[in-house]
Curated annotation (Swiss-Prot):
Disulfide bonds: none
GO molecular function: oxidoreductase activity, acting on the CH-OH group of donors, NAD or NADP as acceptor; pigment binding
Induction: Expression seems not to be regulated by the azaphilone pigments (MonAzPs) gene cluster-specific transcription regulator pigB.
Catalytic site: 196, 200
Protein name: Short chain dehydrogenase pigC
Similarity field: Belongs to the short-chain dehydrogenases/reductases (SDR) family.
Function: Short chain dehydrogenase; part of the gene cluster that mediates the biosynthesis of azaphilone pigments (MonAzPs), a complex mixture of compounds with a common azaphilone skeleton very widely used as food colorants. Within the pathway, pigC intercepts the very reactive benzaldehyde produced by the nrPKS pigA to reduce the omega-1 carbonyl to the alcohol to provide the first stable enzyme-free MonAzPs intermediate, 6-(4-hydroxy-2-oxopentyl)-3-methyl-2,4-dioxocyclohexane carbaldehyde, also known as M7PKS-1.
Alphabetical UniProt keywords: NADP, Oxidoreductase, Pigment
EC number: 1.1.1.-
Annotated positions binding NADP(+): 45, 103, 130, 164, 196, 200, 231
Protein species of origin: Monascus ruber
Recorded metabolic or biological pathway in which this protein acts: Secondary metabolite biosynthesis
Biotech use: As colorants, MonAzPs are widely used in various food products for centuries. Moreover, MonAzPs also possess wide-ranging biological activities such as antibacterial activity, preventing hypertension, lowering cholesterol levels, causing hypolipidemic effects, and displaying antiobesity and antitumor activities.
Amino acid sequence: MPPPRGTPNILEGPGDYDVTSTIHNDTYPAIDPLKADLSGKAVFITGGSKGLGRAMVLSFAKAGASYIAAGARSDMTELAKDVAAAAATAKRSPPKFLPIQLDVTDPQSVENAAVAVKSEFGRCDVVVNNAGVLGRFGGILQTDPQEWWQVLGVNLRGPYLVSRAFLPLLLESELKALVHVTSVAAHLLNPTLSAYQTSKMALLKFSQLVHAEFGSKGLVTFAVHPGNCPTDIMGGPDGLSEHEKLIFVETPEISADTIVYLTSEKRDWLGGRYINVTWDMPELIAMKDEIVQGDKLKVKFIY
């Protein structure tokens, strides 16, 4: 389980313990990708070579996706083997796997990725904007302007460029699912990570704007907090302090399997909303009327 309520936790966000009565830190039967059927569907995931992105790629393979493209700057030779193995273990047909060298901050690189996916797959049903960077800790006066702006380049400009390039393909599909991996940090005020927190809050708003423009056309845009997972962005499990080990307790699999669960069927009413993967998904789905009628899980000004 996540840290008990009351544990000193600078990453505790609104609703962490209150939206659903049950919370999780690892995958669980209700979101098992083996229960999904994404045969015939095509998926594109940025930052797909390692960490959360790698887990997402493998989860979609287990869910039977027929076409999976992963965009990253690093080599994906081993990932291709892992995709085939994951599909075989799940007794699914091996997907066509397309590794794409990608820089999400470069418009031409992103456009080339969209062209490659259309050329190789002829379709794209799900896009996951997962690529992200943390940036250095430090106060505003100690930050390097170029490094500060680079964080926004990856975490905000990247999802914008990818969304813009892939929207025409997504809108031709039936599922039309767009996932932005944001963070609980969007809701927090920890001054030593101003670029990261600014980028993630802006990404929440961008998710709502995409929904406002394309929701009526069937696009479902999710803003997903992937949990506090000790991935490479945090220096891995060995890079955590003893206190941080009490906080960074989520697995990559809960993030990956939750995203597969959310995108495996149309959930239009969740469009433009913030979702924490530690929340119990069946319980969240059962709250549909309350969430829609109260216009909940969105960034807004309340007075």
